[in-house]
């Protein structure tokens, strides 16, 4: 039985919160205490999935997981119910929190209540309440649970309203980019990520060129997508070009296009990336790898807004916003004569620094949870969790390859754990991760020979080969400080072939 005084105290306590996040934490802590549950979570509904906003009694990595309705029947049941949902202990719908309650990782959740949250008859989120005792919530009526849900819905609705008002008063997004699975989502709640989001919001609605600076694997393309999606050009194309993967012989054609007969093999007219991005955005990744001759031609397009296809003297007008990215120190490249100073100043009107993962270690559990859920879906697993000690190991590592290295480390660990444990609900343990000791330099990682021995156990030939190639490329890339051209030379590979292999293995977009 829930007393009116208890509900009133929750309502008053919510008013004391300094921020939305603080209020959310107060809410679920109060709910857990009031209902004597083992775990509770407040989730936002967006784009066909539930996104955790605040948790209590669950593993920290849950905050990074995304629960798509199509992949989680229990979450779908909550979304479609329209009222209190009580799942019986013997429900055949898998609980997404199984194995994610600390100190109960070997047990399945027994009692589960889901409260869909509505605002103006529109689903905006859910409150989930879980317990290890099958009869844990039998003494609480549906009406009492509805009152708890109403408090949660009011808190969430107010937060979403203020968020919309803030967005509309500053940098309105194109309607098609407000939500949905295709939008760019950056995982993390650290101060470094807050600063990054602020910089994106400041520049997105302008027409300024943006130079995204950061190490390999920090997510520079994701930042470019977020800038594009937040701009007035959001409904127009975002065209991607990796400058490091361009052989000099075809680079000009890729950028500016060519006409039939312009050179041997030009059997038809072909539009370049600038034409394809007309009225939209062109993202030039690894801009520092462009040759000086191409830099001069790129500068002309930025200055005058026109270009010429190879073999055609007729100028073409284009209206393109440039987003460029690099892991190089372009200022130093200018000093050394490897990059044009006038082009640098054209591109760096608004520089954005993408933080390295070691600059935001508090985000590692969230990212680990996010990648775990993606791996679970891609591998067709019932559940996938990370042991607490393994999560601590991930948090203590310096991640020279940044977020991309973390993503692939988790994917490899999931493959290894599944093969080793022969289970549809594997747990990732410390020995599944090929990481150096905490704080050790990246060169002290496990030798490739040892990695190969570990990875081939229980794997098919294709899986083992891919895993070995992935690890070898990652280690070489880290040793070459993220320079793909140097990595290709170290591996004695053609640069284009390396980029194609990296894309197939998921190392590059």
Curated annotation (Swiss-Prot):
Pathway named in the protein's UniProt entry: Nitrogen metabolism; nitric oxide reduction
Entry's Gene Ontology molecular function annotations: ATP binding; ATP hydrolysis activity; DNA binding; DNA-binding transcription factor activity
Domain of life: Bacteria
Keywords, alphabetical: ATP-binding, DNA-binding, Nucleotide-binding, Phosphoprotein, Transcription, Transcription regulation
Gene3D superfamilies per UniProt: 1.10.8.60, 3.30.450.40, Homeodomain-like, P-loop containing nucleotide triphosphate hydrolases
GO terms of biological process kind: phosphorelay signal transduction system
DNA-binding interval(s): 484-503
Keyword DNA-binding recorded: yes
CDD domains listed in its UniProt record: AAA
Xref: InterPro entries: AAA+_ATPase, GAF, GAF-like_dom_sf, Homeodomain-like_sf, NorR, P-loop_NTPase, Sigma_54_int, Sigma_54_int_dom_ATP-bd_1
Sigma-54 factor interaction domain residues: 186-415
Keyword tRNA-binding set for record: no
Signal peptide: none
Positions that bind ATP: 214-221, 277-286
4-aspartylphosphate sites (modified residues): 56
Function per UniProt: Required for the expression of anaerobic nitric oxide (NO) reductase, acts as a transcriptional activator for at least the norVW operon. Activation also requires sigma-54.
PANTHER family per record: ANAEROBIC NITRIC OXIDE REDUCTASE TRANSCRIPTION REGULATOR NORR, TRANSCRIPTIONAL REGULATORY PROTEIN
Record protein name field: Anaerobic nitric oxide reductase transcription regulator NorR
Name of the gene this protein is made from: norR
């Amino acid at each position: 039985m829930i007393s009116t005084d208890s509900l009133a105290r929750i309502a008053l306590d919510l008013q004391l919160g300094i921020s939305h996040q603080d209020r959310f934490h107060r809410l679920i802590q109060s709910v857990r205490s009031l209902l004597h549950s083992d775990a509770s979570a407040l989730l936002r509904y967006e784009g066909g999935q539930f996104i955790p906003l605040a948790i209590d009694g669950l593993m920290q990595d849950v905050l990074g997981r995304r629960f798509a309705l199509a992949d989680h029947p229990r979450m779908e049941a909550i979304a479609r119910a329209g009222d209190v949902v009580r799942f019986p202990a013997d429900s055949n719908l898998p609980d997404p929190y199984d194995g994610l309650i600390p100190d109960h990782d070997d047990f399945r959740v027994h009692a589960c209540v889901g409260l869909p949250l509505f605002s103006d008859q529109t689903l905006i989120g859910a409150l989930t309440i879980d317990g290890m005792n099958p009869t844990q919530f039998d003494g609480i009526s549906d009406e009492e649970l509805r009152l708890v849900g109403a408090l949660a819905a009011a808190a969430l609705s107010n937060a979403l309203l203020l968020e919309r008002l803030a967005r509309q008063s500053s940098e309105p997004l194109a309607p098609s980019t407000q939500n949905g699975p295709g939008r760019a989502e950056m995982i993390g709640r650290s101060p470094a990520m807050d600063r990054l989001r602020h910089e994106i919001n400041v520049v997105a609605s302008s027409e300024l060129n943006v130079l995204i600076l950061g190490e390999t694997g920090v997510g520079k393309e994701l930042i470019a997508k977020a800038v594009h999606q937040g701009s007035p050009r959001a409904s127009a194309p975002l065209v991607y070009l990796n400058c490091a993967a361009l052989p000099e012989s075809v680079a000009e054609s890729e950028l500016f296009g060519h006409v039939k007969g312009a050179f041997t093999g030009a059997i038809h007219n072909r539009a370049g990336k600038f034409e394809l991005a007309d009225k939209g955005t062109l993202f030039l990744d690894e801009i520092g790898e462009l040759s000086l001759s191409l830099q001069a031609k790129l500068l002309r397009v930025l200055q005058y807004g026109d270009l010429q296809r190879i073999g055609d003297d007729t100028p073409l007008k284009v209206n393109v916003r440039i987003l460029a990215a690099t892991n190089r120190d372009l200022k130093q490249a200018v000093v050394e004569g490897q990059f044009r100073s006038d082009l640098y100043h054209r591109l760096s009107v608004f520089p954005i620094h993408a933080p390295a993962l070691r600059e935001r270690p508090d985000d590692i559990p969230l990212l680990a949870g996010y990648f775990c859920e993606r791996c679970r879906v891609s591998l067709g697993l019932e559940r996938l969790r990370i042991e607490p000690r393994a999560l601590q190991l991930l948090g203590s590592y310096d991640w020279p390859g940044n977020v991309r290295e973390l993503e692939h480390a988790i994917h490899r660990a999931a493959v290894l754990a599944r093969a080793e444990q022969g289970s549809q609900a594997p747990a990732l343990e410390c020995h599944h991760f090929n990481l150096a000791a905490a704080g050790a330099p990246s060169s002290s990682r496990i030798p490739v020979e040892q990695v190969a021995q570990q990875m081939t156990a229980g794997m098919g030939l294709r899986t083992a080969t891919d895993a070995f190639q992935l690890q070898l490329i990652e280690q070489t890339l880290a040793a070459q400080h993220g320079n793909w051209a140097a990595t290709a030379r170290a591996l004695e590979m053609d640069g284009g072939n390396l980029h194609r292999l990296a894309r197939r293995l998921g190392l590059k977009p």
